[in-house]
Amino acid sequence: MDVLKISPRGYCYGVVDAMVMARQAAQNLDLPRPLYILGQIVHNQHVTDAFKEDGIISLDGPNRLEILKNVTHGTVIFTAHGVSPEVRRLAKEKGLTCIDATCPDVTRTHDLIREKAEEGYQFIYIGKQGHPEPEGAMGVAPDSVHLVETMEDLEQLTLDDRDIIITNQTTMSQWDVADIMKRAMELYPNAEVHNEICLATQVRQEAVAEQASQCDIVIVVGDPKSNNSNRLAQVSEQIAGTPAYRIGDLSELKLEWIKEAKKVGVTSGASTPTPITKEVITFIENYDPNDESTWDTAKKVPIEKILPKVRVKK
């Protein structure tokens, strides 16, 4: 079957850096044990499972602060999504060793909020409710940051039209953000705009927008919790007009989606392991609706192939 490998796709530099830092921590026997990740280092269950094999425990909970309250000793790794200053303070009070894997793009947004909130600015922050990145950003200045996910959320805000900054979560759909920002500027014409869609998110979305129309269907390989993966499927359907399905790995691919297709596009989120995506691509390339021997969708990627290799520090 004809497969269009939509590029760029897969890991971004922030994800790779975060995973390398966590793997180096696992190899560093001088670090206090246990080793914990507050949440998922990146939003991919395969990565979480692989780190468990490395001896790193990924903790889950309603938010980072509640998770941390249950940690009494050891080392904590802050995920690529960033954490609030309150989380950092509590970790320090508990005497925990901290490793910060926050993506530099997220750190830049935190710095903006911190600096401008001190000057009295209010923030309209476009992001996804319940996602850890907005949680961390809002925690920088809780009284100054107003989370907006939809146009309805925006309309319900009542802010003075002065000293306002409009910014956003780094992994949102750039088209959704643009629409909400446009309306926000109509409501608050004196506001400053700081568009923080990260470059990796932007170029992956643009690639889908430009290339998906060549395909009958698009498969996005990514975790259900991965906002950037879900947005890629959204871009395919809403911008390119091509039906799209998000799958965690090959085992979630349904053959009825592709059996009538002449060309299938495949892309993947910024936190999706390359071997997981390659397995999907190889399967679809070899798939023949008339040959049952090509229908096996069992995932076969070994867990030791999931994480990037790192050099052992001497």
Curated annotation (Swiss-Prot):
Residue numbers annotated as active site? E133 (proton donor)
* Principal EC category: oxidoreductase
Q: Keywords of this protein's UniProt record, alphabetized?
A: 4Fe-4S, Iron, Iron-sulfur, Isoprene biosynthesis, Metal-binding, Oxidoreductase
- What is the official name of this protein in its record? 4-hydroxy-3-methylbut-2-enyl diphosphate reductase
Q: Which residues bind dimethylallyl diphosphate?
A: H43, H81, H131, S226, N228, S271
Claim: rRNA-binding is one of the keywords in the record: no
Q: Which reaction does it catalyse?
A: isopentenyl diphosphate + 2 oxidized [2Fe-2S]-[ferredoxin] + H2O = (2E)-4-hydroxy-3-methylbut-2-enyl diphosphate + 2 reduced [2Fe-2S]-[ferredoxin] + 2 H(+); dimethylallyl diphosphate + 2 oxidized [2Fe-2S]-[ferredoxin] + H2O = (2E)-4-hydroxy-3-methylbut-2-enyl diphosphate + 2 reduced [2Fe-2S]-[ferredoxin] + 2 H(+)
> So where does isopentenyl diphosphate get bound?
H43, H81, H131, S226, N228, S271
- Cofactor comment: Binds 1 [4Fe-4S] cluster per subunit.
BP terms from Gene Ontology? dimethylallyl diphosphate biosynthetic process; isopentenyl diphosphate biosynthetic process, methylerythritol 4-phosphate pathway; terpenoid biosynthetic process
Any idea what job this protein has? Answer: Catalyzes the conversion of 1-hydroxy-2-methyl-2-(E)-butenyl 4-diphosphate (HMBPP) into a mixture of isopentenyl diphosphate (IPP) and dimethylallyl diphosphate (DMAPP). Acts in the terminal step of the DOXP/MEP pathway for isoprenoid precursor biosynthesis.
Question: Which domain of life does the protein's organism represent?
Answer: Bacteria
* Family according to the record: Belongs to the IspH family.
What is the originating organism of this protein? Shouchella clausii (strain KSM-K16) (Alkalihalobacillus clausii)
Residues annotated as binding [4Fe-4S] cluster = C12, C103, C198
UniProt xrefs under Gene3D superfamilies: 3.40.50.11270, 4-hydroxy-3-methylbut-2-enyl diphosphate reductase, catalytic domain
Q: Give the EC number(s) listed in the UniProt record.
A: 1.17.7.4
Question: Could you say which residues bind (2E)-4-hydroxy-3-methylbut-2-enyl diphosphate here?
Answer: H43, H81, H131, T170, S226, N228, S271
Q: Name one Pfam family in it.
A: LYTB
Q: What residue ranges are annotated as transmembrane?
A: none
Q: NCBIfam families, alphabetically?
A: ispH_lytB, PRK01045.1-1
**Essential cofactor(s):** [4Fe-4S] cluster
Give the record's pathway.
Isoprenoid biosynthesis; dimethylallyl diphosphate biosynthesis; dimethylallyl diphosphate from (2E)-4-hydroxy-3-methylbutenyl diphosphate: step 1/1; Isoprenoid biosynthesis; isopentenyl diphosphate biosynthesis via DXP pathway; isopentenyl diphosphate from 1-deoxy-D-xylulose 5-phosphate: step 6/6
